[in-house]
């Protein structure tokens, strides 16, 4: 598996570095730091003097970036795989997406780039930064967003919205991305339309039949995962998809949510599916998003 680790020196970025200990040895590991160098304007300074200032600034930023990459390389787990360092200038999201394509990456790993957090309860809302959003929607491969220290990688929650979602998840899991064995809980949520009216036996029977169909679907996917070496079982519930995913992740104390980024109706390449969007803004643990 080819892995691209994008770093920026933030706490979440270092958490992403440490999270690599839970992933399989990479055939090729690229350490990338993208420099978004914005030169200040000097309207009252002669051009030749401003040029000297800009050159000094560029050199200082590059040296800082090289030191960051050296430190990251020193923190890699022993089994991380052969690594190379890349220091590039440009808008981070564009550089990361381009590098992922150039290196034919199977996985991008990065810390959550957030604008801030809202909410006073146990589940805060993360305002996903534009860099994270663009990478999630435009990257050619799966992306792991790490939102804090990762202490384990055993319990994986895999929400599925349909057959295409399941096929994409299986393709990714066939890469055997994890270092140690994991337990996968597959979850499918039948959107709630409200309880049947009292005495409406036909509506109640129809709702039960739909839930049984979803249970059969998720059990079938779990069986396919077991066939390729995973511990897996399925759960089918009724409710609001994003809420049920977050609830299940909290109940199971999931170490990772593995999910698709697009809705069932073919959300465009530049817009996250509504369920993925909601989960990413309140993620209780790292999220690994696949296409």
What annotation goes with each model-predicted range?
Residues 30-32, 84-88, 144, 185-187, ...:
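General small-molecule cofactor/ligand-binding pocket signal
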Residues 39, 55-59, 63, 67, ...:
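Structural beta-alpha unit
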Residues 143, 281-291:
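Short, flexible loop segments at boundaries between secondary-structure elements
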């Amino acid at each position: 598996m080819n892995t691209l680790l994008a770093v920026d020196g933030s706490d979440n970025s270092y958490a992403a570095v440490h999270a690599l200990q839970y992933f399989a040895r990479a055939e090729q590991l690229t350490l990338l730091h993208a420099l978004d160098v914005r030169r200040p304007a000097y309207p009252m300074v002669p051009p030749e003097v401003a040029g000297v200032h800009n050159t000094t600034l560029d050199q200082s930023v590059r040296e800082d970036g090289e030191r960051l990459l050296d430190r990251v390389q020193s923190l890699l787990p022993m089994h991380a795989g052969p690594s190379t360092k890349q220091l590039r200038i440009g808008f981070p999201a564009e550089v990361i997406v381009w590098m992922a394509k150039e290196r034919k990456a199977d996985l991008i790993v990065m810390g959550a780039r957030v604008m801030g957090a809202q909410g006073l309860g146990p589940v805060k809302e993360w305002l996903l930064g534009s860099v994270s959003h663009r990478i999630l929607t435009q990257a050619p491969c799966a992306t792991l967003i790490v939102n804090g220290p990762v202490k384990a990688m055993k319990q994986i929650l895999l929400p599925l919205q349909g057959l295409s979602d399941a096929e994409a998840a299986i393709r990714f899991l066939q890469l055997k991305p994890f270092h140690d064995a994991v337990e996968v809980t597959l979850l499918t949520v039948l959107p709630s339309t409200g309880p049947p009216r009292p005495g409406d036996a036909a509506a109640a029977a129809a709702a039960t039949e739909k839930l049984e169909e979803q249970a059969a679907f998720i059990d079938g996917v779990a069986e396919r995962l077991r066939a390729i070496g995973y511990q897996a079982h399925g759960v089918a519930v009724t409710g609001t998809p994003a809420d049920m995913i977050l609830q299940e992740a909290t109940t199971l104390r999931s170490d990772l949510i593995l999910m698709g980024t697009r809705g069932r109706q073919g959300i465009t390449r530049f817009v996250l599916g509504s369920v993925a969007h909601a989960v990413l803004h309140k993620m209780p643990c790292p999220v690994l998003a696949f296409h």
